[in-house]
């Protein structure tokens, strides 16, 4: 969908960047998960009747974002 494409385009900007950039833009994560080999920042936000969840997978040694995942996030 167009909304999912927009979400992907927005989140792709963080790939290869330092994890502090995500915190500067989105604030402190709702949760931090340590799942080898990644440190995962989880951001949750309610949007109408669904909860938007974004996950950023950070390579801890270099502190760089290597991938992301997004569920139920709507960009208007």
Language-model-derived ranges and their functions:
Residues 1-76:
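Residues within mature, well-folded domains
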